Curated annotation (Swiss-Prot):
Self-association state and partner proteins as the record states: Part of the viral DNA-directed RNA polymerase that consists of 8 polII-like subunits (RPB1, RPB2, RPB3, RPB5, RPB6, RPB7, RPB9, RPB10), a capping enzyme and a termination factor.
This enzyme's EC code(s): 3.6.4.-
One term of GO molecular function: hydrolase activity
Cell compartments where the protein resides: Virion
InterPro entries: Helicase_ATP-bd (IPR014001), Helicase_C-like (IPR001650), P-loop_NTPase (IPR027417), SNF2-like_sf (IPR038718), SNF2_N (IPR000330)
Name of the top EC class for this enzyme: hydrolase
Source organism: African swine fever virus (strain Badajoz 1971 Vero-adapted) (Ba71V)
Domain Helicase ATP-binding: 62-227
Purpose of the protein: Putative DNA-dependent ATPase required for providing the needed energy to achieve the termination of early transcripts.
Phylogenetic placement of the source organism: Viruses, Varidnaviria, Bamfordvirae, Nucleocytoviricota, Pokkesviricetes
Name this protein carries in UniProt: Termination factor NPH-I homolog
Domain called Helicase C-terminal: residue spans: 378-599
Binding site for ATP: H75, Q76, M77, G78, M79, G80, K81, T82
UniProt entry keywords in alphabetical sequence: ATP-binding, Helicase, Hydrolase, Late protein, Nucleotide-binding, Transcription, Transcription regulation, Transcription termination, Virion
């Protein structure tokens, strides 16, 4: 079977194909077959096996010949995107050179997932290290965040020709491309290399596509198709596909036609949702700033407003460039409002930074008296909420020095102890074990041929630790192993984990009961990504049913009311930056969510999963879209909805084939004929324009009805 995605027959063909694959999956699950395909069927979830088969089947079409080059793997966070991609890399490594692109901090995640997959594939083997080394040698890792990423790609394989490219956290790549003002950035260079590559297969892994702006779809699907499938300029894309008045998709049917065959989605199925803990409704804590904090906040806003006016007009050139967001979008990024947002978390007159002194060091040198409710009402409110948690707690802030490090000082003052992994970690020692020795906990780090290093943790002390972008991967791995230990089920070893944006990526945590987001962000998908670190498939299986819940909190700084009303009318900012970011995020989230719904409707599994609104066309074998998007918008939609219904009809046999017909006065010649389509396993109407139609009428009228 071969399918081409630019064809009205593709949706019904893929539905029928996946049904066959699912039946095969169920058979292999129960079999004792030792073939690699059977092993993968037993190792993978059904939704993973569907994509594994469709992508690796040389007869099917995804990524084959002139068809699409790969898939956007849009699977809900915690559903095993890494395992799926590694499965395909193993199966296709004899044909394609696997290159894994991810932030450097996530490279060890792939190694851990690879070991997990090998154990699932070969449960009869006790020593998996040799197989791990053998398979690992086929892979090449490239750091998307490295300054020399281009050189790493050359070292990995010379070029991207003939490679299987796996990009983890792919939304970061899409954002990097549209945030680039020129072609010199890592992200833009990678885009150009992918567009020029020959015989390339691609897997983009993300749980949050279209998180910043629908325009992220442009580089994504251009790379997957290998051509300019979507318009490169922001305004042309918005004119074609975004209704700015209603803040919703425009010409959605035409956009769906272009995207079908390039998306895999898994996440809404009821049987899968049962495997996740329950996410309780978000608690939004609006925290009034203290008078001194608000005074410093207003001074910071004056500086930011002056900088904004000084730079006005500088983005006009950027607006006209291809693959670039307008300047107003760049303005909303991390380089603006940083002062006021950090002061919204913590403000102290005692904080001064000496020459050649790091901000984190200055925070560490502050006396205990600097950490009060007056300097940070937000953190004090958060600590009160944390004390109600029956289990481990995750805290997120975009800001490290004046966010996480300040929280750490508050925790230390409250009597918490910081767990420092480097006290136990040694080079070559990559196995972590926890066990109880009386009332104390022992963390052991050892290698098979080396000494064991032990860290004794008193059960009387409550601990916290941090994961930021600067932490070593071995420290990150140890923290994750200790957190996920059965001995930490209620936070006995690590009660609180503080993470930054970079630190949070790729974490797979168990048992978490609360998530605290210290400041809002105008990209609500980031909040979802943070929550997904502990809301994962099977993450709470060890807990009783009543404890399988996660409570998220979001903290928003609001104006000090007494000072606000003392400011002359007209000079007041009606909303704080926190409030503006939160409201902007909700507005953008509405539009982005609508486009993510379109991605779900275009997913190759949509009809198989029984979702509503799936793109399903009558299989007329016509082109689904015109290559020129502007002309495509003017043409009639070739996708005529496929409607399945039971009808009463008569059977006839013509030239050895069976057909059915109805007498129908509403049709010009008085008959409707149907023929069997083996691909969709259903009867479809024969159009009057088909030469067979007239032959069948003559056959019926000749009185040869069976």
């Amino acid at each position: 079977m071969s399918c081409v995605h630019n064809n009205t027959s593709f949706p019904v063909q893929i539905e029928a194909y996946l049904k066959e694959v699912y039946e095969k999956y169920k058979e292999l699950q129960e079999s004792k077959d030792t073939s690699l395909t059977a092993r993968f069927a037993r190792a993978l979830k059904y939704y993973q096996f569907l994509i594994y088969t469709a992508f690796s089947d040389p007869k099917f079409g995804i990524g084959q010949g002139e068809n699409t080059r790969g898939l956007l793997i849009y699977h809900q966070m915690g559903m095993g995107k890494t395992i799926l991609s590694l499965s395909l890399a193993i199966s296709l490594s004899h044909i394609y050179n696997p290159i894994l692109i991810a932030p450097k901090s996530l490279h060890s995640n792939f190694q851990q997932s690879l070991l997990k997959l090998i154990k699932l594939l070969y449960p009869e083997t006790t020593d998996h290290s040799k197989e791990l080394q053998k398979i690992s040698r086929r892979f090449r890792f490239v750091s998307l965040d490295a300054y020399n990423m281009g050189q790493q790609i050359i070292k990995a394989g010379g070029s991207l020709n003939g490679c299987l490219l796996i990009v983890d956290e792919a939304h970061n790549l899409f954002r990097g491309i549209i945030n680039s003002a020129n072609d010199k950035t890592n992200a833009r260079q990678l885009y150009n290399n992918i567009m020029q590559a020959k015989n390339i297969r691609i897997l983009f892994l993300t749980g949050t596509p279209c998180s910043k702006d629908p325009f992220e779809m442009v580089p994504c699907f251009n790379m997957l198709s290998g051509r300019i499938l979507l318009p490169l300029h922001y305004e042309r894309f918005y004119t074609a596909y975004v209704n700015k008045t209603t803040n919703s998709p425009l010409n959605a049917d035409k956009l769906l036609n272009r995207l079908v065959g390039m998306i895999s989605y898994a996440g809404n199925q009821n049987e899968l949702n049962k495997l996740f803990p329950t996410e309780l409704p978000l608690i939004i804590e609006k925290v009034e700033m203290s008078p001194e904090q608000y005074r410093q906040y207003l001074l910071a806003r004056d500086v930011e407003n002056a900088e904004k006016h000084a730079s006005s007009g500088m983005y006009e050139k950027i607006n006209a460039a291809a693959l670039c967001l307008p300047g107003s979008e760049q303005e909303s990024g991390s380089s603006y409002y940083v002062r006021s947002r950090m002061i919204s978390i913590f403000a102290s007159e005692m904080l001064t930074v000496k020459e050649d002194e790091k901000l984190s060091e200055a925070v560490q040198q502050l006396p205990k008296e600097a950490f009060t409710e007056n300097s940070s009402p937000k953190i004090v409110r958060m600590l009160k909420n944390i004390k109600t948690s029956p289990g481990p707690v995750l805290i997120y802030s975009q800001f490290v020095e004046l966010g996480l490090h300040v929280v750490a000082r508050f925790l230390e003052i409250e009597g918490y102890q910081c767990l420092q992994p480097l006290k136990v970690l040694e080079e070559g020692h990559n196995t972590i074990l926890l066990h109880k020795d009386g009332k104390d906990l022992m963390v052991k780090n050892f290698a098979e041929d080396g000494p064991t290093h032990t860290l004794v943790l008193s059960s009387k002390i409550t601990r916290f630790t941090l994961i930021t972008g600067k932490i070593l991967s071995k420290e990150r791995d140890m923290i994750q192993q200790v957190w996920n230990s059965p001995l930490n089920i209620h936070g006995e070893v690590i009660k609180i984990l503080l993470v930054s944006k970079t630190g949070a990526e790729g974490l797979d945590l168990k048992y978490g009961r609360q998530v605290h987001i210290l400041e809002p962000y105008w990209d609500k998908a980031r909040e979802d990504q943070v929550k997904a670190r502990i809301i994962r498939i099977g993450s709470h299986d060890a807990l009783p049913p009543e404890e399988k819940t996660v409570q998220p909190f979001l903290y928003i700084a609001v104006a000090n009311q007494k000072m606000f009303y003392s400011i002359p009318e007209g000079s007041q900012e009606q909303k704080t930056i926190d409030e503006r970011f939160h409201e902007r995020g909700l507005e953008k989230s509405h539009l982005n969510s609508a486009f993510r719904d379109l991605l779900k409707r275009a997913a190759i599994e949509c009809a198989f999963n029984g979702e509503s609104g799936c793109l399903m066309c009558q299989p007329t074998n016509a082109l689904l879209f015109h290559e020129n998007f502007e002309r495509d918008l003017r043409l009639p939609n070739p996708c005529q909805p496929l409607v399945k219904a039971e009808v009463k009809a008569y059977s006839i046999s013509y030239e050895g084939k069976q057909f059915f017909y109805q007498k129908n006065k509403d049709v010009g010649l008085g008959y409707t004929f149907y023929e069997y389509n083996p691909i969709i396993k259903a009867y479809i109407e024969i159009k009057p324009s088909n030469p067979l139609y007239i032959k069948l009428i003559k056959h019926v009228q000749a009185g040869t009805t069976a």
